[in-house]
Amino acid sequence: MPTDKKFMTGYEVVVCACQDAGAESMYGYPITPTCEILSGWANSGKSYLQTEDEIAAGFGVCGAVMAGQKSFTASAGPGHILLQDSFSMAEAMRLPFVMIVGQRGGPSSGTVIYSQQEVTLACYGGNGEGMRFVYSPSSIAELYKLTRQAFNDAWHYRFPAVVLTDGYTLKTRGVIDFDKIGTIENIPAHQLVPEDKVVHWPNIYTFEEELYDEVMLAQKDFEAVAGDVAMVEELQTEDAEILIIAHGIVAASAKDAIEILRKQDKKVGLFRPITLRPFPKKQLDKTASGK
């Protein structure tokens, strides 16, 4: 991890964060606005595979993490849709799959630079109950921290994780002060499938009762850690009569709006969910009620 100030793009920050998190490999297929993550990772000399499509990339990550590697992918829009197949399998098998998503506007190919239109897909895409962690950074400094945290939480709690960003954040070049971020300890990876014996690790169940038991167990585990994982940022909510709820790069604009409105004697505050899944509902209810 660098120990001083750097002038970096969001792409460079992601690559740096993944390296510092101990990631060993990346599987991906180029798609705007995340192409530079793949090329940046490849240029760093780390192991990578540009696959034939996002379906192959996702299952490549699944295989890598089962073998004990910290691995990840990056995609957007239509590619993100294809990745939900492998990502929901990772949810079912409790694999520490990390995915960086640079959101696109939809439907389908839509726009390529900005959007908040992949929130539902990131939180609940694929068939399943949405038992995954979704982080929404609002600055390039936070992009670094939350990418590091995505790896740590995924490997510690054994749920897949998404860092949900966009083209504005990824293409922004700004100063990131690594001294202010401080030291972040890594949760080590470990081999999930032993080499010395044959293991059958099911990702499909024959009977409805069997599937029900597995889903309920995973949901219980997810709910147990939700309070530890969920994060929020609040700004001037103590006396707020109007509460703005925003996340990601939009929350950065909301902060400027609040400053302007406060100068006009309007009591406006910001509630920013840093994690969209698990969503910090209890904190929002408390803040919105004014208690």
Role assignments for model-derived ranges:
Residues 1-125, 130-131, 139:
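Thiamine diphosphate
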Residues 231, 237-266, 271, 277-284:
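Redox- and metal-dependent alpha/beta enzyme cores, enriched for Fe-S-associated oxidoreductases
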Residues 42-44, 88-91, 116, 148-153, ...:
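Short, solvent-exposed amphipathic alpha-helical segments in soluble enzyme
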Residues 104-106, 165-172, 248-250:
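Glycine-rich beta-alpha junction loops
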Residues 7-14, 219-242, 255, 259:
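Glycine-/acidic-rich phosphate or pyrophosphate-binding loops and their flanking alpha/beta elements
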Residues 83, 172-174, 253-255:
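Short helix/loop capping segments that flank catalytic or ligand/cofactor-binding pockets
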Residues 113-167:
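Conserved thiamine diphosphate
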Residues 45-46, 158-234:
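Conformationally flexible catalytic loops at phosphate/diphosphate-handling active centers
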